[in-house]
Every structure is written in structure tokens, then in C-alpha cells.
Amino acid sequence: MSKVTVVGAGAVGATCANVMACREVASEVVLIDIKEGLSEGKMLDMYQCSTLMDFDTKLVGVTNDYKQTANSDVVVITSGIPRKPRMTREELIGTNANIMKGVIENVVKYSPRAIIIVVANPMDTLTYLALKASGLPKNRIIGMGGALDSSRFKCYLAKATGANINNVDGMVIGGHGDTTMIPLVSKATVNGVPVSQFASKKKLEEAVANTMVGGATLTKLIGTSAWYAPGAASAMMVEAILNDQKKMVPCSCYLEGEYGQSDICIGVPAIIGRKGIEKIVKIDLSKEEAEKFAASADAVRKTNNVLHEIKAI
């Protein structure tokens, strides 16, 4: 028996819960929100899909009662205000930091053994805050961003190469931000063959550029943050944990010397399993990639400094 709680019944949280229910990732999924009736209504709607989608996951909707989330194996935190058009992730930090601290207090109280996946933005900084505020071991606090960014990268690579998307592999490291992420073309492949064999340099550069503005593009089109892919990426990470898949996933991890960085949560490839982050994978970076990663870390630290300025940590 396994139990997962999703904090925040907005579009991302509800999508994550729905994907987990349909895939029967956990025995029980709890969706909690501060808005009266929102979680209950969405979980009732989801439950009424069960005969159509042939799943038997226990679904529980809760309004601000963390007792019902007790003993969760994994907690996915999506709660926070969404990014609006022309709003940077960094501008979200003041409000979302306060929300995160309140959530973490309740998660640690009722599910002290849980692995926490942070989805709310600015993701790397809020992952860092979750680690510091919770006092939990670093392997149990994971930021989702790299998984989403890598999925977007693979989609654009598939378009650039004309390859079947299921045969494309690609990875994005660095911060989860428009200017801080680093799509690694040098590591991207189609059926194990470098993508440079399938697409021109110009097309690959376009794939990188489109990936880096992927979130902003969607925000401009729909007027708010995306939800389908972020929700699915979160659900995929939960599945990797509960099924002990030992899956390599680019995600925000706390570094202690890896990649030349310390005391920071930032996107790197990691093996994800039942213990959370089971291993940070060291990949060789070119001089240019290493310089970009260092610059990305500097940018994330600049955002982290706001936490100290507002006395969040």
C-alpha cells in the first residue's frame, strides 16, 4: 500500500493527481488545497473517471486538513501563485516562500518519512527552502524542473530531426528558468546516435532556443503557467520513487561539491528510486557547458539570496 499527497489543487496539482490515478501509481492519492471544496470537487470528478479509465485508486479531496495526509510516502508540492504573463519566476518568490514554509511544517508533522517533490516556482529556490525549512536529509527533497525541461527539449529535438519522439533522448541541466537552463545538445541522441547526425546546427540551435523559452511560450499562449506536462513530469517522478525504478532523471538536487557547486539546489542528472535521490550522476561537460552551468548556479544563488533578505531562512 502506498500513499501520495499532492498539495495544491490547481491545474498542475490536479493533473498530477489524475495521471497518478489513471496509471495506478499509488494505492491512495490525496489532493489538498486551502480553497473550500476545490480538492473535494476535483477528486469526485476524477473518481467518476474510474469506470471509464479502468482504475481503482483511492482518491481523497481535502480542504486544509493535513491530518488526512498523514503517513504519505511522497508529497508533491505544487501550491503557490502561478506565473502571469511577463512575470519572472524570481518575482514569485516572496509569496510562494511563505506558502512553502507553511506546507513544509505540516508535511514534516504528519508525514515525517515522506519524500518531497517541489514543483512550485521559482523551483530551485523553493527546493532549497524546503530542504532548509524541513531539516530532512538531502536525498528526500527533489525539485521537478529538469524533468519537465528535458521533456520539452526532447519534443523540440524530435521536430528538428524528424525522428520518432520515443527514440529521442535529451537532457537539460542547470536552473529551471528561461535564462538559466542548459539543454545539452552534445548529449542528445536518436537511438543512441548523436542528434548532429540528423539535424543541422541551425535546427538544433532553434530546438535549444525553443526549449529555453518553453514555459514563457505557453504562458503567453494560454495566459498562465502550463499544467499538462508539469503534472505528468511530477507523476513520473512519483512513479520512479514508489516503484524503485532507479531511473535517471534530471532534477533539482542539493549539491555538496558535485559539478563544482555547494549549498545549492540545481538541476543535474540523478538516479531516482525508493530512497529519493539515490545518486547524483556526474557527466562530462565541455568547457562551454561547464561555464554555463557555473553562471546558472550564480543566477540561482542570486534568487536564493532573496530568502535571506525576506528572512525566510
Regions found by a protein language model. Give the residues of each.
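Extreme N-terminal starter segment of soluble prokaryotic enzymes
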Residues: 1-4
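Glycine-rich Rossmann-fold phosphate-binding loop(s) that bind the pyrophosphate
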Residues: 9-10
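N-terminal Rossmann-fold NAD(P) dinucleotide-binding loop
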Residues: 13-14
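Conserved N-terminal Rossmann-fold NAD(P) cofactor-binding segment
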Residues: 34-72, 301-309
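Rossmann-like NAD(P)-binding element
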Residues: 51-114
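Rossmann-like NAD(P)(H) cofactor-binding subdomain of soluble oxidoreductases
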Residues: 88-154
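C-terminal substrate-binding/catalytic lobe of Rossmann-fold NAD(P)-dependent dehydrogenases
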Residues: 134-140, 149-313
